């Protein structure tokens, strides 16, 4: 890792980690004032630690080159997107810290992620690596008491024990967040494309429960006030999102704590919303934010669906910057710059590159762990085509469990990766990452290929041929319920049930739309069955010049 020394170079490394290693090796770690001064001043003695190699995963993570004025809360916030932080050791004299995650998997995810995205605290890049030891034990010195109080405050809020969090925060924990407001003031600079209240909600809700949002224009700048359920979430969001762009080279977030401690929302509409009061009126005279802004900027309209619509990821999804790093069930797993699905869909609809993503312009995906006996270019074209216009597909000739899928642009590739990674296809969970290739090469004339490479650049089955297509507003994660459209009048419910059970799947529910019988919902026995049915039956000829359209539904029957 560039700029990072090994965690323990046996017999050669000296300093705070050496001291830490020696103490842990000999028993529970006790950082007394004497040993602290040793760590800060006496580096002369050689030390032989255990011989675990430097890159071996551990629950304990070593953080170096911290700013001298860093708080416990800021250090803890580095681990929050990846899981629960269970212990913290601050070595401020050395500008270092150790944090312990609740699982080795969470720690591994964190280290892998920060390997590709250098974290910055107070404008200073910091360095993260595995520690040489599996467990962190601390004493009750004043420094560690502050660290433990900070941890208690964060973990109490995460577990919903707000009363305990308040009492813990009342202790002088050295956390900046302890006395701060749960309300953030957000300014969006360089507003080239409209940013809606719903896009803000979906971005910021990854860091905690958003209670209220008010948007307004002041000094010719689009601004928002956003209230979290607790100050810890506000601190976490500010640290992660301040200075980031929502879209490529524009819509920069500037975030500060508001002097207000609570927001008073009178109307639920496009300018303000109280998520705790769905009964509030819309306010007839309140102008629609997305319409007025879209008109003012002449930009493609950013989707303004329900804040809950399309926001769910499958149980396993990829943090884009980590090139498809899989994060199972991470609470608040939106890492810095990761754009939620609805905002990504908005970007894709306007052909906007999502900023800050490793290979944001790369439209080629590497799909692995495929079933080589069953996968075909056509099946991948149909499945990935739910999230964008697939240009080319190549199943690797000598490794048929791997394929390259080229989308129309990087935003569509991000959408497909975030929604499909980890889902089962032909009985195997697929793994999706960004490829190092910039495009998929067609085979040369006379080159053996066995039909494993297909060019779909001019396919009539592309769902998103027009920039700003409304189909981008109907992109949802794979689910057991499918949305059917373009059904001719002669086709009955029974006909469709028979059709969808013909590939071995079980139909558990069906209903036509009341107002439009050309559309219906059908529920399969599992998400995997629904994925297979979509692949098999999208564009199926129903007669009378009607070809069935199949997509994943946000609704259930």
Swiss-Prot record:
Its GO biological process terms? mRNA processing; negative regulation of mRNA splicing, via spliceosome; negative regulation of muscle cell differentiation; regulation of alternative mRNA splicing, via spliceosome; regulation of cell differentiation; regulation of RNA splicing; RNA splicing
Q: Which PROSITE patterns match?
A: RRM
Domain RRM residue range list: 59-143, 184-260, 363-437, 480-555
One GO cellular component this record assigns the protein to is: nucleus
Chief subcellular location equals nucleus
Purpose: Plays a role in pre-mRNA splicing and in the regulation of alternative splicing events. Activates exon skipping of its own pre-mRNA during muscle cell differentiation. Binds to the polypyrimidine tract of introns. May promote RNA looping when bound to two separate polypyrimidine tracts in the same pre-mRNA. May promote the binding of U2 snRNP to pre-mRNA. Cooperates with RAVER1 to modulate switching between mutually exclusive exons during maturation of the TPM1 pre-mRNA. Represses the splicing of MAPT/Tau exon 10.
Q: This protein is called what? A: Polypyrimidine tract-binding protein 1
Gene name, please?
A: PTBP1
